[in-house]
Amino acid sequence: MLVTPLLLVTLLCVLCSAALYDSSSYVYYYQSAFRPPNGWHLHGGAYAVVNISSESNNAGSSPGCIVGTIHGGRVVNASSIAMTAPSSGMAWSSSQFCTAHCNFSDTTVFVTHCYKYDGCPITGMLQKNFLRVSAMKNGQLFYNLTVSVAKYPTFKSFQCVNNLTSVYLNGDLVYTSNETTDVTSAGVYFKAGGPITYKVMRKVKALAYFVNGTAQDVILCDGSPRGLLACQYNTGNFSDGFYPFINSSLVKQKFIVYRENSVNTTFTLHNFTFHNETGANPNPSGVQNILTYQTQTAQSGYYNFNFSFLSSFVYKESNFMYGSYHPSCNFRLETINNGLWFNSLSVSIAYGPLQGGCKQSVFSGRATCCYAYSYGGPSLCKGVYSGELDLNFECGLLVYVTKSGGSRIQTATEPPVITRHNYNNITLNTCVDYNIYGRTGQGFITNVTDSAVSYNYLADAGLAILDTSGSIDIFVVQGEYGLTYYKVNPCEDVNQQFVVSGGKLVGILTSRNETGSQLLENQFYIKITNGTRRFRRSITENVANCPYVSYGKFCIKPDGSIATIVPKQLEQFVAPLLNVTENVLIPNSFNLTVTDEYIQTRMDKVQINCLQYVCGNSLDCRDLFQQYGPVCDNILSVVNSIGQKEDMELLNFYSSTKPAGFNTPFLSNVSTGEFNISLLLTTPSSPRRRSFIEDLLFTSVESVGLPTDDAYKNCTAGPLGFLKDLACAREYNGLLVLPPIITAEMQTLYTSSLVASMAFGGITAAGAIPFATQLQARINHLGITQSLLLKNQEKIAASFNKAIGRMQEGFRSTSLALQQIQDVVNKQSAILTETMASLNKNFGAISSVIQEIYQQLDAIQANAQVDRLITGRLSSLSVLASAKQAEHIRVSQQRELATQKINECVKSQSIRYSFCGNGRHVLTIPQNAPNGIVFIHFSYTPDSFVNVTAIVGFCVKPANASQYAIVPANGRGIFIQVNGSYYITARDMYMPRAITAGDIVTLTSCQANYVSVNKTVITTFVDNDDFDFNDELSKWWNDTKHELPDFDKFNYTVPILDIDSEIDRIQGVIQGLNDSLIDLEKLSILKTYIKWPWYVWLAIAFATIIFILILGWVFFMTGCCGCCCGCFGIMPLMSKCGKKSSYYTTFDNDVVTEQNRPKKSV
């Protein structure tokens, strides 16, 4: 027996922060010859403890245990068991330890000691102070190992492992074999020195950390968070970041969705037709000499036996030895096709004597049943009994049937049709293996009928909707009450990620809102502490920066807590004043131009689950993928680093640009320019009107008036203005008009004039002219007013319709502009769409579906095909990672540009020409847009140009001094000449003015200084003959082949937002709205005050006098003026009232008496 020395490493500890059970322990075994390089390795077997028990004594009340015997076993049926004594150990004596053993199915391995002659039934007597480790099978010892007690002074542990049936004594390997079998039972036989602790274990995968060939740390692949993370990425050391993972659960259920609810199957019916043998001769004597014809033997299936020719034959019933004999067949040949079942069936016909022919054929074993028929044949058939062999009997037809009972063969008259009903028992809300309309896979099925039925999906007899990878996304089943829609979801959340912060596994990010989670950006965070999920806590702490892992604006600390990242710059930033409060004067030679500019400031982050993308749910593919090493880790590290940089750069960008609390734009005092909204605003006015007293004392009548009515009211103002009514008449478009309202005074005046004109006939007839004239003028007024009202109604309707059309056009233009922004955003996902489309590519394999490949081919061929898919899909992921890197670099540059635009264009006024819009910058207003910012630049651009003569500078040559030069100072402009005179003007605006001392810089010389160099100093300047372009081109473009990169593999277009045309259209719509202002014919409201009649004023006067008399009577007749005297302030009355009231006193008996006042002494 080959025994390989093994090293036992026992690690009994709590699994740090990722422990699944508080009392978890495990044992890790590996060969001592295994010396891997330093680092983490998925090697060997670990055994996790699943049950712990103890025992103090199993020798009973006897003074000791019996050495050399096996006793005290317990059934375990486990991968491993460890039986350990106390740390001090147990003595090798019958008073403490006797035997320890393990049963591996039919093999038993044990350790014992026995020093008695004829007292050791299994091992025989051993040498003193030696131990025996033996293995036996079927009661026969086939392995013996004798070791000294000096090596093992006491018994401490006995461990059995199914891996190569390894057995360890006190940690040393003492037995192994080439078989791997679970431990069925084990035990320790002892009297004292215990207790013995039994640890039953199950085998799990393990990731071990080796240093110099020795395992220093072990992580169990047991489904715990730490085990899932470590065993999926083959490492136990993780840098801060996010790590997607898949927790594949064991699928125990399976269902099939059939295309048809029922299937009809028509089986083949085999027809056997029998006929009368016309040339058959009478049989010789003896039953064995009867010849058979037309033998038909049925196999499995359905059969029909046609005996139609028997219609001319007469059936002969059984009568002792005569006629038929078929007690084992309860049917006649006429009913043999009535659905009878057989395991075997053979039919043949013969011709023999009716006397005894059938009965002897059955007795002799030639048939199971025999049917006899008479056809009136001659008596030429010989007998079959021993005494009748030479006699002749009537010949008849004999039908032999040989059969056995069963169900392989069934008779029928017509081809049978069997209907199989298919029942779609769909398992919901659990991970299952499915076969949906012939497509197999694994998924989590949910019923989505309520949300999908209203959209008429798959209404035209469709069965399923496939996703980009070719798998079923939604399928429909015809139920009893209509269509039922189901959605296939991944068994596990493909977006779930482990969060590692400070080198520790602290939480999980998932797209599912689970109990105890808290929302971070667009994901839900679940904190993990000691391997368990904790309830969420509110985010209360703010940090200026995050040295750990961050997700958006949230910082995840090593203890799993969440803090909000608020940079200090954002807290101390002072908001600039962006309100426009002053009018900017622009020269007439310039135009105000509005320019829009879109800058992308953020990118969409992606989460890559490399293993899920490449292999899906295929376990075979995942095993094969282990050979590719850390390629997924490299891709993931690139994507994670991009996400981290994106978050930090985006926070820094907003901290340097967006002040705290500045979230609401202030648009007060902003002119609307040519967009006239005066119709929507209240125009302040102070119309001339009468006083409050006039409104109280007069009745006012309002009517629609003309623009001439104001002049009429001014003309008739005054006490006797009604007398000037006709004189104040006005003309409107050549017609004489008067307001249609006539007061009582005017009515009296014109009536009197009319009556007087009729008093003396023709002599006074001219007095009626004023009455007729004013009547015609007022009729003109009414007619013109009605005409203007009708015209204004037409203008209002036309203008309103035009305004509505302009508004609709404006909304359409705005929609197009927003659509272009949306297109920019949608283009960000083009590379993702291309990556997902790669799942449909087979990359040279027979199929793009991994499950189909493994179903169609054997393991070796399938692995070769899947290897092509893995290589192709990894290439797609690499392209995606590279594209995101390039996009991040571009977006970072765009953010830098946006920062400059905000600082220079928004917060200040740029002096750079055409940096903030086109031309000289005036004002910039930023606006949030998807994934970026839209800047609206206001600038002024030249409209006309003046052709002037520019001069670099002046050289001054004084008479008594050396010459010097003057040039314009930086930023002051340039010198120009106009009509023989010299001026200075700004370079960007023509404003010539006299040159002053502050506009110039004095140079010491009028000469320009140059540096003289030769050709060898500046090698970048070459002559034409130094470079032969054709010669250089021929070095590259000759007959040789040069491989150029395939740029189609990386096609990423930088989106550019262009909404200039839409802004122009909106400007046109604004102009159209301005054109829709209604220019109404001016009308006025004429308000005429009518005075009350004279009797009304007389009644008012009488009422006032009566009121005064009653008030005076109350004052004098009450005896005491009461409060009225004081209130009205009538001092004399108050004094008199006071004197009068002192002479009278009212007593309780209501007797009024006069009192004498004493005289005053002076």
Swiss-Prot record:
Topological region Cytoplasmic: 1117-1162
Domain of life, per lineage: Viruses
Presence of the UniProt keyword Signal in the record: yes
Name of the gene: S
Region entry Heptad repeat 1 (HR1), spans: 769-874
Glycosites: 51, 77, 103, 144, 163, 178, 212, 237, 247, 264, 271, 276, 306, 425, 447, 513, 530, 579, 591, 669, 676, 714, 947, 960, 979, 1014, 1038, 1051, 1074
Marked site positions, Cleavage: 537-538, 690-691
Residue stretches spanning the membrane: 1096-1116
Extracellular membrane side: 19-1095
PROSITE patterns assigned: COV_S2_HR1 (PS51923), COV_S2_HR2 (PS51924)
Modification after translation, per record: Specific enzymatic cleavages in vivo yield mature proteins. The precursor is processed into S1 and S2 by host cell furin or furin-like protease to yield the mature S1 and S2 proteins. The cleavage site between S1 and S2 requires the optimal sequence [KR]-X-[KR]-R. Additionally, a second cleavage leads to the release of a fusion peptide after viral attachment to host cell receptor.
Coiled coil: 822-866, 1055-1083
Keywords: Cleavage on pair of basic residues, Coiled coil, Fusion of virus membrane with host endosomal membrane, Fusion of virus membrane with host membrane, Glycoprotein, Host membrane, Host-virus interaction, Membrane, Signal, Transmembrane, Transmembrane helix, Viral attachment to host cell, Viral envelope protein, Viral penetration into host cytoplasm, Virion, Virulence, Virus endocytosis by host, Virus entry into host cell
Disulfide links within the chain: none
Biological process annotations from GO: endocytosis involved in viral entry into host cell; fusion of virus membrane with host endosome membrane; fusion of virus membrane with host plasma membrane; receptor-mediated virion attachment to host cell
InterPro entries the record matches: CoV_S1_C, S2_sf_CoV, Spike_S2_CoV, Spike_S2_CoV_C, Spike_S2_CoV_HR1, Spike_S2_CoV_HR2
The protein's name: Spike glycoprotein
GO cellular component: host cell endoplasmic reticulum-Golgi intermediate compartment membrane; membrane; viral envelope; virion membrane
UniProt keyword Ribonucleoprotein, yes or no: no
Family under the similarity heading: Belongs to the gammacoronaviruses spike protein family.
Positions occupied by motif Di-lysine motif: 1159-1162
Domain description: The di-lysine motif confers endoplasmic reticulum localization for type I membrane proteins.
Quaternary structure (record): Homotrimer; each monomer consists of a S1 and a S2 subunit. The resulting peplomers protrude from the virus surface as spikes.
Region: Heptad repeat 2 (HR2), residue numbers: 1024-1105
Signal peptide span: 1-18
